[in-house]
Amino acid sequence: MQGFLRSLFFGVKKIPKPFAPLVEKGVLKEALELKKDRYFLKEGFDIGKVEKVKDKAFFISLAKNYPKDPLIKNLPPSFKTDALILCQIECSKKRPIAFFKAALLNADHTMIAYLAKKNNQIVAIPFKEPFKKPVSLKHSQKSLLELPRHCVVKIDTKKREISEILGALEDPLIDENLSLSLFDRVKDFSKDCLNLAQHYAQLKASDFKDRINYSHIPFITIDPKDAKDFDDAIFYDQEKRVLFVAVADVSEFVPKHSSLDKEARVRGFSVYFPNSVYPMLPLSLSQGACSLKAFEKRLALVYEIPLDNLKNARLSQGVIEVRANCTYEEINHFLSANQSSLDKDLQQSLLGFLEMALKLKKERLKKGFNFNSFENKLYLNKEGRIEKIETEKESDAHTLIEEAMLLANQSSARLLDEHFHNKGIYRTHKEPSLEQQKRLYDKLFDYEIVRPKNMGFFPFLEHALKIAKEKSIEREVSRLIIKSQNLALYSPLQESHFGLGFASYTHFTSPIRRYSDLALHRLLKELLFYQAKGCSYLLEETPELCAELNALQKKAALIERDFIKRKFARLALELLEKEFLGVVLEVKDWVVVGLKEFIGLKVLVKTNKVFKPLEKVRVTITHADLILGQVRGEITERIKEHVS
């Protein structure tokens, strides 16, 4: 049903029989209009899911994107999280309002809950709505007592029976499965899918004809040290000033409409945890036949990009053999110490392209923005607890890969612009609205960063980061700036990418872990190598596909965030009643304090006292909630000077 409802945003020629009653006499009648022989959802109407947070209900659209999820008004209390509803949307400055119009599909009859004793009875408490009335189960109290304390279970809400046992809440090794289950991420591949993947994984590069042989070119991959799937490789020919970017040709192993394709599309993206990955494709492909492993012949789509004339980039179907799989750390060591066991031609390639990459980046940042995200990387021990936290900062090795990938992605967007009249699968990013900009100015004012009169938004961002660097508060200011931005989205129509400063952009370089890139590969291959016969068909599905991908992208981010929050809550349980030095990050209903010793751990403090962002404080951890992934505490001392 979701597929049909999503298609109404983009127009359907015919209403399928099972859904005709909804349209002819039912709840959708007033919300649809006929335009150019297609049924469309009228302007102002929207279809989406219910997401409950404490006593509030928010609306998550199936296809549209809002700066903030709309708050639902007049929702009947019987509606649970994930119910599908029709709403009328009223946009306001702060947060859009969704007025409930009709029910389309109540929530799935399954729920993740944990068992707890209430009034001497073991009951199930919903994870997503722990403040609601507990669910009494049909199982005997004796059988429930045999399960671990705070056992996490999946429940069939119609039958009020346990359908799956996930494990004990207190066990840190449950966290991956729990986060995936909470957001309905499909974990396992079907038998058909695995068999098909195994079949394709056994094919050799030599089995594929009409490909250019690039195996003499010494490509190199550069990835994080824990990477297992290698999507992309580069080589720079200094003499010809040509950059080669090779990207795994995944579409050769994933036929359109096959079980492999359908299950990849349902996932949309690979989900990454600190110690594992839940891939979009089976491991025999994602870490096997498609992965660009050193000294293995692999199928690839290869861009040859002349740096003196970027518009003359050429895309070919090739066979490559990567010379080395390297980590960012290894390449950074080589670039700083000029010592490496890499072959001389690889060393020359890296040094030559670094010089060009730094120039490209400098030029790009005249129009684009350098978002310093200060990503926190968690390292977990065998028990699933946080062992250490490292902050990863951008390096020259990152710049090498980033600039190469940006060039390949831009080259792909240029092909869409020229051949499909600005239609396809684009990656877009809207500039923050005036209201969003004003909120950021106000927050930065609290950080004693003032916007000079008549300074535009983009120059001010650079100005703010420059001051932040001088004040040694770059991390905090970067976090605020990133939070003020709109989400980058997939779009079937060309729009600019504000953050990067590009008029046109797409995703091409990660087809092992992103379905968007796989779909783009099919479109470009059809255009360049197969007489463009199937292009119109592939283009027709891009509006619906982009809407799906935007929803799946959000889901993947929520899964990863939920996991991290719970890991920090577990860490906090070991630190109860201990005092730490912290800095005030935010002041809203709660004062949010970031700990200096455990970067990324945020403590919520309820207080009547007035605090300012960047105040240095001492905070005691008093409570950690594994359900909500929250850590709470008390401020025991305020220190006058700002954090340095």
From Swiss-Prot:
Q: Where is the S1 motif domain?
A: 573-644
Lineage, top ranks: Bacteria, Pseudomonadati, Campylobacterota, Epsilonproteobacteria, Campylobacterales
Which purpose does this protein serve, as stated in its record? 3'-5' exoribonuclease that releases 5'-nucleoside monophosphates and is involved in maturation of structured RNAs.
Cite a GO CC annotation.
Answer: cytosol
GO BP terms: namely: mRNA catabolic process
What are the UniProt keywords, alphabetically? Cytoplasm, Exonuclease, Hydrolase, Nuclease, RNA-binding
List, alphabetically, the HAMAP family matched: RNase_R
Superkingdom as given in the UniProt entry: Bacteria
Gene name, per UniProt, is: rnr
The UniProt entry's sequence similarity note says: Belongs to the RNR ribonuclease family. RNase R subfamily.
Protein name per UniProt: Ribonuclease R
What the record says about disrupting the gene is: No visible phenotype.
Give EC number(s), comma-separated. 3.1.13.1
Q: Which organism is it from?
A: Helicobacter pylori (strain ATCC 700392 / 26695) (Campylobacter pylori)
EC top class, as a word = hydrolase
